[in-house]
Amino acid sequence: MRRRNLSRLTIAGVTLALVATAAPAATAGSGHGKGGDDRSKGHHRPAYKNIGYFTQWGVYGRDFQVNDLQTSGTAAKLTHINYAFGNVSAEGKCFTGNIPGQADAWADYARPLDAANSVDGVADTDTQPLAGNFNQLRKLKAKNPGLKVMISLGGWSWSTHFSDAVRTDASRKALVASCIDLYIKGNLPQDGARGGQGAAAGVFDGIDVDWEWPGSPANEGTVFRPEDKKNFTALIREFRVQLDAYAKSQARAKAQSAKGKGHGHGHHKPKPKHYDLSAYVPANPKAIDAGFDVKRLMKDFDFVNLQGYDYHVSGEKKTAQQSALYAKNDFSVDQTVRDWVKRGAPKNKLVVGMPTYGQGWTGVTGGGKGLGQPATGPAPATWANGYEDYKVLKKLADSGTFKVHRDTKNGHAWLFDGTTLWTYDDPQVLRAKTSYIRDKGLAGAMFWSLDGDTEDGELVTAVHRGLNRR
């Protein structure tokens, strides 16, 4: 079983030595009601994106099912669900199967769900071609028209082979074709009654490339090389070309079918579906410059999801903020946005990442409010030390044993009981961030990951309300 994406615990750790090279963040308050609204006046602005990552492995130990998104009301407040993750093989192809640590077809499309765990209350049968998460996502879309589901490729653990897979034009074409065949066309490997040609057709509405990171060191064993930057640009171009070509072929097939049924006269030709193309991208300017030709890439991306968390992690010797809106001479949401804009990214294609978890330290000394103080190590937690879900941290805050501290000027919060500290985002912090998104004319918000929220989807709701207030 894949573990939770602990990737995001180590991103900042890899790059902390580089933090001094980052340009200073803006002082707090810049852009807040001070003429910071960059949207053109008099034009209707497209709806803000509210994106959540759904983890493939969360259905096991965490028992977080697709149906939980329906019963909590979360699905109705999301625009996109990114399914994490699809893997790329050593042969340079998208693939699935039942291979521990590499693929989990059982969770994806083979596992039967009973009526109680099914989005529409109907249990899976032994003979249907599609079951598992993919079938539940299909049902979730039926209940929530307009909701898009994207397959996210890679992640911290599964970015191993990207660099090798994109070295030539032929290898890029083969990789992209394999991903479209598996996820967009839905041609799943046969697994007993499950799978087959077109079994998952219509489940996915686009592709999210989560290569961590082109041109930069990341997880142990992940290949990277200097030419990743140009190859990544070419890969994204190939995804856009092949997705558009497939959409046009679908539209032609529909037109031919309508014509064959005598509906061809007096009817408009079907408009090709637009498949979204996005990526998860780093906050560290060194990583941006090493792997991302921003101006060229953004022509093909519909949007990118900015790293808005793990600015500091529990493996560090001192406590610090992990997701501040502003920070001086440090990583922050505002600094990340400005670094991408400075390199040519349109503001209306930038989605701000938000955590549904906290980073925590124990053995904190030095007194005061705990922030910026020495610690002995990561705080004990439910699934991995130093990393705890918001739903658990909320209970700590409500218990009275921890005090909630806020830096309202810089937009972040933390819990401290005298020895243990957790830095996290709560609804109050998210309200400040949604105001920032609106003021700056950004594209919206993204959550890593949906299983960390409360049972009633408190964080997703806060962002939905903040982005869509009138």
Describe the role of every protein-language-model region.
Residues 1-29:
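Secretory targeting and sorting signals
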Residues 20, 29-82, 86, 252-272, ...:
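N-terminal module-boundary/linker segments of secreted carbohydrate-active enzymes
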Residues 27, 395-470:
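Extracellular low-complexity, Gly/Ser/Thr-rich intrinsically disordered linkers
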Residues 43-192, 227:
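Glycan-recognition patch characteristic of GH18 chitinases/ENGases
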Residues 81, 151, 209, 239, ...:
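Conserved, mostly hydrophobic/aromatic
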Residues 97-119, 214-392:
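Substrate-binding surface in catalytic domains of secreted glycosidases
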Residues 154-155, 183-226, 310:
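Active-site groove signature of glycoside hydrolases
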Residues 168-207, 235-244, 289-302:
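An active-site-proximal structural segment forming one wall of the substrate-binding cleft
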